[in-house]
Amino acid sequence: MYRECIETNKKNGGSICIFESFVLSLQKITVVFAQKMDWQTAIYRVGSYLRHCLTARHTGGHGIHSPYLFEWVRLVMRDEHSYYAWEKIEKVRERMLGDTREVEFVDYGAGIGNRESENGNREARDRRKVSDIAKRSLAKKKYAQMLARLVNWLGDGRLAMGDGRLMVVELGTSLGVTTAYMAAMDKRNKVITYEGCPAVAEIAKENWKALGIKNIDCRVGEITADMLDRDLERVDVAFIDANHTYTGTRAYFNVLAEKVHPKSVIVVDDIHYNKEMEKAWHEICEDERVTSTMDLYQMGLVFFDKDYWKRDYRIRV
């Protein structure tokens, strides 16, 4: 309904920026209250989204002077072509959204508050339905597919290693839907994904087996910067969707940024999730190793090619 209102307003010659910002903010309010979050968080999220809508530009790539980034907007972000594996992956998503099984859920991230386990580690444990995990944790279809297109675009002769593979890293496997999207684009690519919750990781593995995807290496346990530094030598594409705190996000990014090359891309999810995540994102944008960033509100993309001037973009999706 909201998208129809926006298109109607455009056809009638209305003020696109203000009207679209207003309508999409109403949509965001609906989503926020559906998630039943506390009112302070709800107000912060809505305000953050409204600010993004009012300041975001370059919806079709206009105003982006870098040919490389303009191509990314045109061929990755705005591409609407589907791929053969996507329909099967979306069926997995539907099954997860209807899965009433309960599992022991372990959280090492923003959801733990000040709780501490018996062994002294900061973690939270409770019983959750798989369907609830899916509703809260799975990336929306359009973003998961955009990540898949990103992997495909980068692997199309741009980043491939000597044996033709990309090294794709994901922090926060969840139920494995986004992982499947990225891995399915080219079976030669190697995907290393990290998940803190053993029960959730097992379900993700079941999903990949059902899809026939075999190029995923899932590593289970608390995700630490030391672990990443030890495990990874090279990063072509990275997706950070774990531990939505300032400390965790900065630690992950700092390690990954030492493993990249000029054509690598790091994607940070939920950059406006809370004040801590926004602080982490702002510091990432200012990092001297970074040349360009794209704020899509839901996620941010980080580029490292020194051939282009440093520039930060906000784009409406």
What are the language-model segments listed below?
Residues 13:
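Extended, charged/glycine-rich binding lobes that contact polyanionic ligands
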Residues 10, 18-19, 162:
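Intrinsically disordered, low-complexity segments enriched in serine/threonine/proline/glycine
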Residues 23-239, 243-265, 271-317:
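A short alpha-helical cap/connector motif
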